[in-house]
């Protein structure tokens, strides 16, 4: 294990979502947003190969976003607002049916954005849970109230079956590498408001531009 992996803690990942917010919480820096997701996927990998079908999809979406960020128009992808303005004004988004721009930044980020809602619900449930709470139940409830609404039956089935393999709450908290249960709860209480702000702001921008149903 490398030294960076040893130090890996969920707190550092959630801090990326704090670093996202600029201009009085009126914009989101995409580089930090993507880094937050990279950290989350790394965390998910430590839960075992059962989630590899999830991480594969998440990694491919992260890579799409990274290629835009590092590409010739990278500056246009610096923030959420600049990406939306650039892609819409340059006709780079398939609005009703996937055709010429199957992997626009807008549709790719929308998938991550929907997953962020799951994360928000799941972590909040974990924060207020007690020792007897089952992580698989919390995760399933969070999923059913968010991402599941956008997934076909077969994906929902695969996802809910994989949740059964989630470790107990204590093990989960240990993997987070934050400290005692009290410290985990405090850390979640401190960082979740930033995740919520990022989620709410993204939702607002997508809603304003009618982008919430991108194919
Ligand atoms: C901790 C357990 C992880 C459970 C992850 C829950 C999400 C289930 C999602 C199932 C996704 C199935 C794969 C494919 C889906 C795609 O069809 C779909 C749509 O994309 P497209 O291109 O076909 O239109 N993709 C998505 O919906 C994106 C899904 C991304 C999910 C990313 C999840 C990353 C998870 C990180 C785990 C963080 C753990 C947090 C720490 C917990 C602390 C205790």
Curated annotation (Swiss-Prot):
Annotated Gene Ontology cellular component terms: cytosol; endosome membrane; Golgi apparatus; nuclear outer membrane; plasma membrane
Molecular function, one GO term: phospholipid binding
Catalytic activity: N-(hexadecanoyl)-sphing-4-enine-1-phosphate(in) = N-(hexadecanoyl)-sphing-4-enine-1-phosphate(out); N-(9Z-octadecenoyl)-sphing-4-enine-1-phosphate(in) = N-(9Z-octadecenoyl)-sphing-4-enine-1-phosphate(out)
Primary gene name: cptp
Protein name: Ceramide-1-phosphate transfer protein
Record InterPro entries: GLTP_sf, Glycolipid_transfer_prot_dom
Keyword RNA-binding: no
One annotated GO biological process: ceramide transport
């Amino acid at each position: 294990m490398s030294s960076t992996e040893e130090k890996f803690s969920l707190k550092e990942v959630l801090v990326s979502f704090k670093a996202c917010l600029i201009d009085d919480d009126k914009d989101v820096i995409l580089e930090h947003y993507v880094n937050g997701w990279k950290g989350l996927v790394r965390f998910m990998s430590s839960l075992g190969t059962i989630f590899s079908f999830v991480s594969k999809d998440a990694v491919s979406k992260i890579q799409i976003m990274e290629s835009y960020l590092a590409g010739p128009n990278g500056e246009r992808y610096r923030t959420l607002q600049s990406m939306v303005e650039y892609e819409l004004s340059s006709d780079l988004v398939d609005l009703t049916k996937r055709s010429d721009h199957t992997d626009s930044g807008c549709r790719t980020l929308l998938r991550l954005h929907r997953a962020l809602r799951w994360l928000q619900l799941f972590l909040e449930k974990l924060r207020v849970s007690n020792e007897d709470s089952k992580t698989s139940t919390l995760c399933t409830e969070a999923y059913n109230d968010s991402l599941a609404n956008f997934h076909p039956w077969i994906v929902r089935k695969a996802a809910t079956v994989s949740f059964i393999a989630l470790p107990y709450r204590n093990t989960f908290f240990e993997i987070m590498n934050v400290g005692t249960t009290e410290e985990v709860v405090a850390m979640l209480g401190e960082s979740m408001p930033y995740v919520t702000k990022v989620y709410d702001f993204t939702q607002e921008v997508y809603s304003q531009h009618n982008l919430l149903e991108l194919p």
